[in-house]
């Protein structure tokens, strides 16, 4: 997912750069890039103009080789259409669907939360001074630090990125409370939806805590830079498409929970291979929580597909066309202007979270929600949305193969990128 979002953003940028090249070859390349974007579901607002037989100046080329359709008026109209599309989900009859599903949520979502006395806490997974005494705590910390020395920098960067994402929990609870019909309107509502939000937040809160404590004890990281990154991310917030629609929001969170489980699970396996059993246990425990949370959100979207299939599949297509924007996409350490892209590239390179994982998650959700089997109750728009979603994994697969082939032909070499989290040591990544 990280890789897909980064790739598509850079591809859009490349189209604009190519427009300044006063040759037909540049126009053809840019047209090919735009075509790839369109095939993947991301439309471009620009199209190539007809070329002249005489070679124009660079300035003239900038002005004439590409024409932007509709300019600002078209962009405003497009944004208005997008907003109108998802705002239709806020109609009373649509929100009543969620209100009627509250007893279902009570029976099928809340049981996936565990009582505080039954779940792990950070002190269960790390040395506890009160339990071990001064000498025992000191010895346990020395052992933890010795094992942490074996974890490569690439995995440390991915670990910090995951931890920063987890620590921005206040943003995610705020996001959940923007969903109409399911939000916690008073902060202490007794509805099943509101109790789920608070219970989910309580479980998620342990994830950033335990990772932060491990990092402090390990001595491998510049914790002040890590903490500044968390501070900036929470202050920056996050942007999500269709922010008030529970249909779109639940699709987004179902995808995100599975992505987080995959990322933490991969990290656990990798660091175990490098000898850090304590960190592997921590990441494995977090991944287990995320699997339960994924199950809850996957269930509620499956129920929406059952009771309102046309609206559900159109919401899914809407989100996939605009990409599942990562919650930590606005992360900033105050030094690297492209920090998230570099973190995403490190995750791709290390195999912690890859484009293939993004595709696999999409394929999994298509199966879980039986999207391919949808037929009855679909409008023409719903059928087109179904066909788009079901065709998307293969399009992503072809994009992966073409990107891999191009990289092999170009013999592209990794680029060393310094990360402030690890005292500006470089990590080699493949940049788009």
Predicted regions and their residues:
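Non-heme di-metal
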Residues: 2-21, 29-33, 37-47, 54-55, ...
């Amino acid at each position: 997912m990280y890789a897909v979002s980064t790739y598509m953003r850079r591809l859009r940028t490349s189209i604009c750069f190519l427009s300044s090249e006063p040759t037909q070859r540049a126009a053809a390349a840019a047209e090919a890039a735009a075509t790839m974007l369109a095939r993947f579901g991301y439309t471009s607002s620009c199209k190539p103009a007809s070329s002249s037989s005489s070679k124009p100046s660079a300035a003239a080329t900038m002005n004439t080789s590409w024409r932007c359709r509709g300019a600002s008026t078209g962009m405003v109209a497009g944004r208005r259409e997008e907003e109108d599309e998802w705002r239709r989900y806020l109609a009373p009859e649509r929100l009543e669907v969620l209100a009627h599903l509250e007893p279902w949520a009570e029976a099928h979502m809340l049981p996936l939360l565990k009582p505080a006395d039954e779940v792990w806490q950070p002190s269960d997974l790390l040395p506890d001074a009160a339990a071990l005494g001064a000498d025992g705590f000191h010895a346990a910390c020395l052992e933890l630090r010795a094992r942490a020395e074996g974890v490569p920098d690439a995995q440390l960067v991915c670990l910090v990125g995951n931890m920063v994402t987890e620590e921005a929990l206040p943003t995610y609870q705020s996001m959940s409370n923007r969903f109409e019909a399911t939000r916690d309107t008073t902060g202490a509502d007794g509805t099943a939806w509101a109790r789920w939000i608070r219970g989910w937040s309580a479980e998620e809160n342990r994830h950033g805590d335990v990772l932060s404590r491990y990092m402090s004890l390990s001595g491998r990281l510049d914790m002040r830079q890590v903490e500044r990154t968390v501070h900036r991310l929470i202050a920056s917030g996050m942007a999500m498409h269709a922010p008030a629609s529970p249909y779109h929001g639940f699709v987004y969170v179902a995808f995100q929970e599975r992505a987080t489980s995959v990322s933490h699970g991969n990290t656990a396996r990798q660091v175990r291979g490098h000898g850090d059993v304590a960190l592997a246990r921590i990441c494995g425990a977090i991944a287990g929580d995320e699997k339960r949370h994924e199950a809850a959100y996957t269930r509620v979207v499956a129920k929406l597909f059952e009771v309102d299939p046309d609206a559900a599949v159109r919401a899914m297509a809407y989100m996939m066309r605009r990409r599942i924007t990562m919650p930590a996409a606005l992360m900033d350490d105050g030094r690297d202007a492209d920090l998230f892209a570099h973190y995403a590239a490190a995750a791709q390179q290390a195999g912690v979270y890859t484009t293939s994982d993004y595709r696999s998650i999409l394929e999994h959700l298509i199966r879980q929600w039986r999207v391919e089997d949808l037929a009855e109750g679909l409008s023409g728009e719903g059928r087109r949305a179904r066909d788009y979603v079901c065709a998307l994994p293969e399009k992503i697969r072809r994009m992966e193969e073409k990107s891999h082939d191009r990289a092999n032909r170009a013999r592209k070499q990794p680029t060393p990128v310094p990360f402030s989290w690890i005292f500006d040591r470089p990590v080699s990544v493949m940049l788009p």
